[in-house]
């Protein structure tokens, strides 16, 4: 009997030790919500005059204001892993003169790393936008869900993002020195 207890204790210690040194996987969980990104004043007219347009990749969408002063990208949130919030679909930025485009597929908005990552045409991830500031963050809890809202995200192109867009679209209209857009994010998940 004593051998069995010792063997069981040894087995538990080995298993616990193996778990302690095993890499920790980030738990991804389903989520719902919306991410919107509206171009800052002057951005869409500057892009349009340079022959640059935006379009949505389903289920994402891009809508333009009545007088084409701004464009709003709307993407559904489908999952989260800690501070990274994954969306579905994406958007495409196109040079209308040459037809070349850069896709931002399944953008991930990370509220701790303060970046928006995209899967590009080449299959690589790139931090296309940086989140310079988040004006407000609110959380609401019900017995079954927890909802968090981030409002007034100041979005700017990263250096790598601006260089990628300028090179791929054969333009120089993309810059890191100006606010590109304002973002809002709502994420709901089960408790």
Where are these regions (language model features)?
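N-terminal segment immediately downstream of the Sec signal-peptide cleavage site
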Residues: 26-83, 154-191
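Secretory targeting and sorting signals
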Residues: 1-27
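N-terminal compositionally biased, intrinsically disordered segments and leader/signal-like regions
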Residues: 7, 17, 73-75, 137, ...
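A broad, structure-centric signal for solvent-exposed, well-ordered loop/edge residues
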Residues: 8, 61, 111, 116, ...
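Intrinsically disordered, low-complexity segments enriched in small/polar residues
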Residues: 15, 31, 87-88, 97, ...
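Acidic, glycine-rich flexible loop segments
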Residues: 112-159
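Predominantly extracellular/secreted and cell-surface proteins with exposed
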Residues: 59-131
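Terminal low-complexity, poorly structured segments
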Residues: 5-10, 15, 145, 151-153, ...
């Amino acid at each position: 009997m004593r051998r069995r207890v010792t063997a069981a204790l040894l087995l538990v210690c080995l298993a616990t030790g193996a778990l302690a040194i095993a890499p920790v996987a980030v738990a991804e969980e389903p989520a719902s919500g919306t991410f919107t990104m509206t171009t800052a004043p002057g951005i869409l007219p500057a892009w349009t005059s340079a022959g640059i347009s935006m379009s949505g990749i389903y289920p994402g969408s891009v809508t333009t204001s009545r007088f084409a002063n701004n464009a709003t990208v709307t993407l559904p949130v489908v999952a989260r892993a800690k501070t990274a919030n994954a969306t579905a679909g994406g958007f495409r930025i196109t040079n209308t003169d040459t037809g070349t485009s850069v896709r931002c597929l399944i953008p991930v908005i990370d509220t701790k790393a303060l970046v928006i990552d995209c899967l590009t045409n080449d299959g690589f991830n790139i931090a296309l936008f940086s989140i310079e500031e988040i004006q407000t963050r609110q959380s609401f809890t019900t017995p079954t869900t927890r909802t968090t809202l981030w409002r007034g995200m100041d979005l700017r192109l990263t250096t790598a993002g601006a260089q990628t867009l300028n090179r791929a679209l054969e333009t120089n209209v993309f810059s890191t020195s100006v606010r590109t857009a304002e973002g809002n994010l709502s994420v709901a998940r089960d408790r």
